[in-house]
Amino acid sequence: MASGTIPVQNEEIIKSQVNTVRIYIDGAYGIGKSLTAKYLVRADENRPGYTYYFPEPMLYWRSLFETDVVGGIYAVQDRKRRGELSAEDAAYITAHYQARFAAPYLLLHSRLSTITGYQKVVCEEHPDVTLIIDRHPLASLVCFPLARYFVGDMTLGSVLSLMATLPREPPGGNLVVTTLNIEEHLKRLRGRSRTGEQIDMKLIHALRNVYMMLVHTKKFLTKNTSWRDGWGKLKIFSHYERNRLVETTIVSDSTESDLCDTLFSVFKARELSDQNGDLLDMHAWVLDGLMETLQNLQIFTLNLEGTPDECAAALGALRQDMDMTFIAACDMHRISEALTIYH
């Protein structure tokens, strides 16, 4: 079926419940996730059902307010390097920009959660509706802030403040973390020339590592009840570890995941702990929130080294293993409205 405006009274969707797969496609910037999503929409035109893509909210970031958020966050780092801003002031401004990045994701997530957050369903057929959302709020509230912390652009306190606003995920979320070898990743970054964006190698390595740590975090939680399991034996997250994460891509998608491989490990810091090494309660609540968000998210990895058509086919094939929920047919028009506004 062709993609576009969702039919409200189409004979194809007249049942009371519409089986829906909700996919968040994510990863470091410049890998090719957005192109893959667009190619899947095109490929699905020849299959039953409807596929809709919510792109990155560039209009919101670049044109809706007085400041271009994409260019602005890089400009802050340039001003810091030139000595025009102190490291402390630059960190505060960076946190402000990062919150601005998060705003449209939070708005969309809140809107869709009231529509798509029904119980999981088992459906062996192709879904009636596939929703592909370019990035989960985890990106702007957890992954990018942590990467900025690793490179020295943000404080750990600012990261925790952003993470505290992370929304809970309703049932049926599927997060695809896209990956790519570093050589091809850099080649694609140089080819896209997005205005105001810079190729910051330390930030790129940090993001690649953070997203793999996110994958390990989910794996760890599938075998353990909480981030508290093994916390007492976990070593303090050192400056050495922090520096390693920005120099090269060192975290791989291995089969085993220990607590030290997860995002939780970053917060084993003296300034966040009491005299016994236990995380202070308010900070612990933030990690609890991350754990609760991940509870309703399946996480997949997808290598994008192939052609756009091949990558789209691989993304589409993942649907057979994804969680599915239903949307009430009477709510389909709300999806259409959200798609129109978000564009």
Curated annotation (Swiss-Prot):
GO biological process, one term: DNA biosynthetic process
Enzyme class label: transferase
Residues annotated for ATP binding in this entry: 27-34, 188
Substrates-to-products reaction catalysed: thymidine + ATP = dTMP + ADP + H(+)
Enzyme active site: 56 (proton acceptor)
Short name of one Pfam family: Herpes_TK
GO terms for MF: ATP binding; thymidine kinase activity
Keywords tagged on the record: ATP-binding, DNA synthesis, Early protein, Kinase, Nucleotide-binding, Transferase
SUPFAM superfamilies per the UniProt record, alphabetical: P-loop containing nucleoside triphosphate hydrolases (SSF52540)
Transmembrane segments: none
Family named by the database record: Belongs to the herpesviridae thymidine kinase family.
Role according to the record: Catalyzes the transfer of the gamma-phospho group of ATP to thymidine to generate dTMP in the salvage pathway of pyrimidine synthesis. The dTMP serves as a substrate for DNA polymerase during viral DNA replication. Allows the virus to be reactivated and to grow in non-proliferative cells lacking a high concentration of phosphorylated nucleic acid precursors.
Name by which UniProt lists this protein: Thymidine kinase
